[in-house]
Amino acid sequence: DRVELRLTAAGITAIISTISSAPGLQMAWESNINDADQGAGKVWANHATLSSATVLYFDDVEGSGASINAFIDSLDDPSAPTSATIYIQEAGSSPAGVVFQVTGAVTSASTYSKVTVAHIATYGTLTDGDSVGVTIAFSGNNGALVNVVEDTTPQLGLIP
């Protein structure tokens, strides 16, 4: 639960809310699996069985109307084979969620983006209209192995 204290001319008002948000981008889970815009602030998959999903769709704006298009479209920018991990968690006291890794290209449609993913884990059940938070962790670029010299001295017990 969330508690807010507000100072007003009449005194202090306490507001207790049982609605809590999940961390990250505030969106709504959509159960429709079609490759078409489902409306503002929605995130959805291309398969009803999330462990079989290979594409996540993100509307170009999150729940408050802020544009996330450039951010989502950058998920395939790192050069690592798995460029990011996406955590989608339902808001509330007993949340459900799903974890995917970005494994391929991001394609920008006119009002939403398509992200190629591989399923990692699911806990609980996300249902249509659930308020969810979307958290993304980038993996970074692959490092270059240049000027690497193998030194076996410590393993062989030799003293230089």
Where in this protein do the model-derived segments appear?
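Glycine-rich, low-complexity segments
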Residues: 2-66, 121-160
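Histidine (H) residue identity feature
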Residues: 47, 73-77, 119
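Short coil-to-beta transition motif at edge beta-strands of beta-rich domains
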Residues: 69-90
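Subunit-assembly interface segments of extracellular/virion macromolecular structures
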Residues: 92-95
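Short beta-strand-centered aromatic/proline hotspots
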Residues: 97-106
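Short, solvent-exposed secondary-structure boundary/capping segments
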Residues: 106-120
